[in-house]
Amino acid sequence: MTEPLLSSAAPEMKMEETSSSSNLRQPKKRFVGRRTADAHAQKDASISSKDVESTSVQRVAPRRNPRTLNQVPPEILDDPEIQAAIELLPKNYSFEIPKTIHRIRTSGAKRVALQFPEGLLIFATTISDILTQFCPGTETLIMGDVTYGACCIDDYTARALGCDLLVHYAHSCLIPVDVTQIKTLYIFVDISIDTSHLIATLERNFQPGKTIATVGTIQFNATLHGLKPVLERAGFKVVIPQIAPLSKGEILGCTSPQLSPTEIDILLYLGDGRFHLESAMIHNPTIPAYRYDPYSRTLSRETYSHDEMHALRRDAINTAKSAKKWGIILGSLGRQGNPNTMAMIENHLNERGIPFVNLLLSEIFPGKLASMSDVECWVQIACPRLSIDWGYAFPRPLLTPYEALIALGVREHWDSANSGVYPMDFYAKEGLGRTKPQQALQGAA
C-alpha cells in the first residue's frame, strides 16, 4: 500500500557541488617486495656501492606511469562530433558513450551485443547508430529478450551469436566480468535528479535526529552517496547499508540488507516502482519504509502484507512436504538459473528417495506447469520473487530453493531461525543464488 506524504515546493538551497573526479576509484598502491626493490636498486647507477648497506637509506626508483588502458583518451572525450551525437540522448542519463567507444576500439570487437532493460529499449537504436558511426567496421546487435534484472545478463546467447563484446545497461556487475563467457562491459546508467526537492521534502516530513537508512537501485547509487553529507548537515543520521557483494546502498528485488530496528528509524528508498523496495520491506518488516519517486517528485509511506505473504508461503511448504513427485525448474533467462543449486536440491531428493523431473524454462507460467499434472510440487531456481509474488496463481506449490530446503528438513523455518523474518539474501555472498560446486554436494549419498 502506498500513502503519499507532504511534498515541498523545494525552496532555493545552497548545495555543495561534488566534483565527478572525486567519485573515481583511485588506483591501489602497489606493494613492492624486497626482491623487486633490490632489483631496482642494482639497476640504479646513481647509487654507489658505498651506500648499499643494511642501515643506509636507499633511493627508490620512481613508480611507472599508471596504466592508461581503461582511461578514455581526450581525442574521444573531446570529439565534437561524438558530443553532438550524445546530445540526442537524455542529458541526465549517463550512457557512457565515450567509454563504450573506447572499449570497442581497444578490444577490436567487430560484433557487439547491446542488452537493455525494457525501460531503456527506447534509446537502443540511437545508441546502436552512434556506436557504429564512431566504430567503423563494427556491427551492433540489440538483444530483444526481456531483461528483468542483473541476473538476466545473456552472455551465453551473445557468444552463440558470434559477438565479441556484450554491453549490458542499467544493472550492476552481479555476474563478474571474469565469469562471463565473452568480454562484458557494464554501464550502470547513472541518473541525475534534483536532490534539493528531496532534501526539502524530508526536512518537512521528518524531525532532525532521525536515523535514515538509504537504499536504491544502481542508477541512483551515486546520488545516495552524495545525499549523505547534505542530510547529515541538516541534522539527520544517515546509514548506507550493504549486503555483500552488492554495492553500499544497492538492493535487488531478491537481495537486500537486514537492518537493526533499534538503530534505524526510517528506511528510505530512492527510485520508481516498488519491486526493489519490497525486498527491503520483507527483510525489515518492523522498520517504516518510505519511497521517494524522483520522476513524480513524491514521497510516500509504503506498507507490505507480511502476514498474508507468510501464510501463503507456509501453506506451500506444508503442501510440498507430502508431495510424491517433485519438479525442478532451472531458469534459462540469462544467468537466472544456478546449476549448482539445482544439483544440491537433486541430491537431497535422491537421499530421501523422492522422484523428480527437471525442466528448463526461460519464463515460468501456470499453464505450462499445469500440463504436467503428475508433478505435485515445483521448485524454481530462477527468481525467488516469482514464488513470493505469484506462487498463489500456480496449481501446485511453487517453491524457492530456500523454501524447498525447509520442506525437505534441511533448513530451519524462518519463524524459528530468523526471528520470524523471511530472508531476502538470494544473491548475498552465501546466498542460494551463488551456490558453489562443493556446496552442491550437500545431501549427496
Curated annotation (Swiss-Prot):
Cofactor: how bound: Binds 1 [4Fe-4S] cluster per subunit. The cluster is coordinated with 3 cysteines and an exchangeable S-adenosyl-L-methionine.
Upper lineage: Eukaryota, Fungi, Dikarya, Ascomycota, Pezizomycotina
Any matching Pfam family: Diphthamide_syn
Reactions catalysed: L-histidyl-[translation elongation factor 2] + S-adenosyl-L-methionine = 2-[(3S)-amino-3-carboxypropyl]-L-histidyl-[translation elongation factor 2] + S-methyl-5'-thioadenosine + H(+)
Cofactor: [4Fe-4S] cluster
Role this protein plays: Catalyzes the first step of diphthamide biosynthesis, a post-translational modification of histidine which occurs in elongation factor 2. DPH1 and DPH2 transfer a 3-amino-3-carboxypropyl (ACP) group from S-adenosyl-L-methionine (SAM) to a histidine residue, the reaction is assisted by a reduction system comprising DPH3 and a NADH-dependent reductase, predominantly CBR1.
Keywords: Cytoplasm, Iron, Iron-sulfur, Metal-binding, S-adenosyl-L-methionine, Transferase
Binding site for [4Fe-4S] cluster: C151, C254, C383
Subunit and interaction comment: Component of the 2-(3-amino-3-carboxypropyl)histidine synthase complex composed of DPH1, DPH2, DPH3 and a NADH-dependent reductase, predominantly CBR1.
Metabolic or biological pathway: Protein modification; peptidyl-diphthamide biosynthesis
Family: Belongs to the DPH1/DPH2 family. DPH1 subfamily.
Primary localization: cytoplasm
Protein name, entry field: 2-(3-amino-3-carboxypropyl)histidine synthase subunit 1
Entries under InterPro entries matching the protein: DPH1/DPH2, DPH1/DPH2_1, DPH1/DPH2_2, DPH1/DPH2_3, DPH1/DPH2_euk_archaea
A GO biological process held by the record: protein histidyl modification to diphthamide
Region annotation Disordered: where it falls in the sequence: 1-74
EC number: 2.5.1.108
GO cellular component: 2-(3-amino-3-carboxypropyl)histidine synthase complex; cytoplasm
Polar residues bias locations: 45-58
GO MF annotation terms: 2-(3-amino-3-carboxypropyl)histidine synthase activity; 4 iron, 4 sulfur cluster binding; metal ion binding
Subcellular locations according to the entry: Cytoplasm
Organism for this UniProt entry: Aspergillus fumigatus (strain ATCC MYA-4609 / CBS 101355 / FGSC A1100 / Af293)
